[in-house]
Amino acid sequence: MDVRFYPPPAQPAAAPDAPCLGPSPCLDPYYCNKFDGENMYMSMTEPSQDYVPASQSYPGPSLESEDFNIPPITPPSLPDHSLVHLNEVESGYHSLCHPMNHNGLLPFHPQNMDLPEITVSNMLGQDGTLLSNSISVMPDIRNPEGTQYSSHPQMAAMRPRGQPADIRQQPGMMPHGQLTTINQSQLSAQLGLNMGGSNVPHNSPSPPGSKSATPSPSSSVHEDEGDDTSKINGGEKRPASDMGKKPKTPKKKKKKDPNEPQKPVSAYALFFRDTQAAIKGQNPNATFGEVSKIVASMWDGLGEEQKQVYKKKTEAAKKEYLKQLAAYRASLVSKSYSEPVDVKTSQPPQLINSKPSVFHGPSQAHSALYLSSHYHQQPGMNPHLTAMHPSLPRNIAPKPNNQMPVTVSIANMAVSPPPPLQISPPLHQHLNMQQHQPLTMQQPLGNQLPMQVQSALHSPTMQQGFTLQPDYQTIINPTSTAAQVVTQAMEYVRSGCRNPPPQPVDWNNDYCSSGGMQRDKALYLT
């Protein structure tokens, strides 16, 4: 590495360099002898020493021209006000490289942050390499960032904020007295002198309080070590988790169908059946293993003709087994096709038979007749019933109709009619109520229906002929959505007529022809 010295310029520059902020001058680091003396250390000057005034500027080579042996670093994006600001002192040409302290340490004055002063050693060897022996003493606590930044004073000034706090954590663990602090009052006095004069502008794109997005080398080292330890601990815990797992239970064998034909046995099995009884009779205390050995020896000594007899029996049993197996599989296929059909055909009769059983009365004719007349007396009820229980049979499904006097007369012709004054007041009341309830759904349908039946049908014949059971209330689900009820309530669709009723409903006018009533005869529930 060559050392270059540059003479001072003839004329002073117009302005200081851009990175130097505020009235404080900036010490140009390119003119220092980087290997001044036998200790091969360089040092930053202390605040009590003289500095070059801000009006003096010297041209220097770019950083790329210097051949530094520096590990690759990624300087964080810190605001410019975090750089070291030096005090302005009297003008004059002095040596830019000042003598260092006796212990080879350079003082690092952190400006604009409440941290004690930190001194970091520049550990450059004679051959330009880093002295890693002092750093390898405590790799877990100290980091090599100090050596990376200390190869150049400006790089040391660009050290992240978190680094002084990291070094300050365990001062007792740092060897060779590499960590020293000053009094808090002295630090505050220095900070007051440097910061009290003027407001420092922020030229950095990041705000003053922003933190570096790039992790410092120290944090990355500690994170790598933490990851290694977590991997080791995780590796130790894995066998325990594997041991904690329960062994898989063997799958249960499917139960064999008793109708399935059994597979035929081999010729040796047939011979074993025949001879086993004889051997057991001779040796009752013989175990199964001993019996099998005796049978095997007898099978080996058996003649070929006798073996063929057993083999023929086995072949005949195989043919019979194949026939039985084909018939068994055909029966399984036929059952698989017939079972779903039986289920589908058996369901509709159950539904049809269960629905009419809800209605009870002394006469099916009367109950059916009153049911139809009650539906016509309360046309506002029809959208509710069709929406709540759409699966009712067609003869039970309500039919909207506005012809109230006709339907009442049909109901009254079957039995003795009650006085008209008893029916008409509740009838008009419910007609007015039903105009608003399909849209608002103020009451559940299960609560509306019994009240309407009791209030609309006051005559004893009505109460005898049609009695609403609690089972019917369960069929009508009161929790259906109001949207379905509203959409069906808005559609006043009748057979051959789509005219909606006028808002002041006049039941004597504005209704369709009475042709729709020709089908509204007595409905019998079957």
From Swiss-Prot:
Query: What GO molecular functions are on record for this protein?
Result: chromatin DNA binding
Q: Where is the composition biased (Polar residues)?
A: 192-203
Biological processes annotated in GO: CD4-positive, alpha-beta T cell lineage commitment; CD4-positive, CD25-positive, alpha-beta regulatory T cell lineage commitment; CD8-positive, alpha-beta T cell lineage commitment; cerebral cortex neuron differentiation; chromatin organization; leukocyte differentiation; lymph node development; natural killer cell differentiation
Note the superkingdom of the native organism. Answer: Eukaryota
Q: Where is the composition biased (Basic and acidic residues)?
A: 228-245
PANTHER family per the record? Answer: AGAP000281-PA, THYMOCYTE SELECTION-ASSOCIATED HIGH MOBILITY GROUP BOX PROTEIN TOX
User: Where does motif Nuclear localization signal map?
Assistant: 237-256
State its role. Answer: Transcriptional regulator with a major role in neural stem cell commitment and corticogenesis as well as in lymphoid cell development and lymphoid tissue organogenesis. Binds to GC-rich DNA sequences in the proximity of transcription start sites and may alter chromatin structure, modifying access of transcription factors to DNA. During cortical development, controls the neural stem cell pool by inhibiting the switch from proliferative to differentiating progenitors. Beyond progenitor cells, promotes neurite outgrowth in newborn neurons migrating to reach the cortical plate.
**InterPro entries assigned to the protein according to its UniProt record, in alphabetical order:** HMG_box_dom, HMG_box_dom_sf, TOX_HMG-box_domain
Q: Which residues fall in a compositionally biased region of kind Basic residues? A: 246-256
Q: Where is the composition biased (Low complexity)?
A: 209-220
Sorted keywords for this record are: Chromatin regulator, DNA-binding, Neurogenesis, Nucleus, Transcription, Transcription regulation
Q: Which organism is it from?
A: Homo sapiens
Q: Which SUPFAM superfamilies match?
A: HMG-box (SSF47095)
Q: What is its main location?
A: nucleus
Disordered, as annotated region: 138-178, 192-264
The protein's induction, as recorded, is: Up-regulated during differentiation of NK cells from CD34-positive hematopoietic cells in the presence of IL15. Down-regulated in mature NK cells.
Effect of changing A267T: reported as: Found in a renal cell carcinoma sample; somatic mutation
Q: Which Pfam families match?
A: HMG_box
The entry's protein name is: Thymocyte selection-associated high mobility group box protein TOX
Q: Where is it found, in Gene Ontology cellular component terms?
A: nucleus
| DNA bind region | 261-329
Q: What is the lineage of its organism?
A: Eukaryota, Metazoa, Chordata, Craniata, Vertebrata
